[in-house]
């Protein structure tokens, strides 16, 4: 799997393209919302996995790390921010430098709702489509 990911990142680089790399999808972190799971991450496992990925791709200059995976970072009693903090820290530790990171929220929302003050977040991301059956203009 990762050999194929390596090839795609390198191919994109030859065309001067950036890759938005999502380390995991949201249902692997929290299944209480939607998706089939299984939930496989704890903050500790997320940090280790992040370190693995950061080390593997430390030489790649065409990556934007996108944490999240179509989920709110906080939903009812579920707060996944500590897990995303751990994964972000692992990526940076593995890479040996601060990497460019954002968060993919659920449709019709911005990551700023839950994560705007997070030190690991470099810029907010907005998913404008398919949120509650309508597109959301970025300026709303």
Segments from the language model and where they lie:
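Extended polysaccharide-engagement surfaces of secreted carbohydrate-active enzymes
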Residues: 137-140
């Amino acid at each position: 799997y990762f050999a194929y990911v390596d090839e795609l990142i390198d191919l994109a680089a030859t065309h001067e393209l950036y890759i938005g790399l999502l380390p995991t999808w949201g249902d692997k972190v929290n299944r209480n919302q939607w998706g089939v799971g299984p939930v496989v991450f704890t903050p500790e496992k997320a940090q280790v996995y992040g370190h693995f990925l950061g080390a593997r791709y430390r030489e790649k200059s065409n990556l934007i790390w996108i944490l999240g995976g179509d989920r709110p970072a906080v939903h009812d009693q579920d707060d996944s921010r500590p897990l995303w903090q751990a994964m972000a820290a692992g990526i940076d530790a593995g890479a040996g430098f601060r990497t460019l990171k954002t968060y993919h929220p659920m449709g019709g929302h911005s990551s700023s709702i839950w994560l705007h003050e997070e030190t690991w977040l470099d810029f907010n991301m907005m998913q404008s489509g398919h949120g509650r059956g309508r597109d959301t203009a970025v300026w709303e």
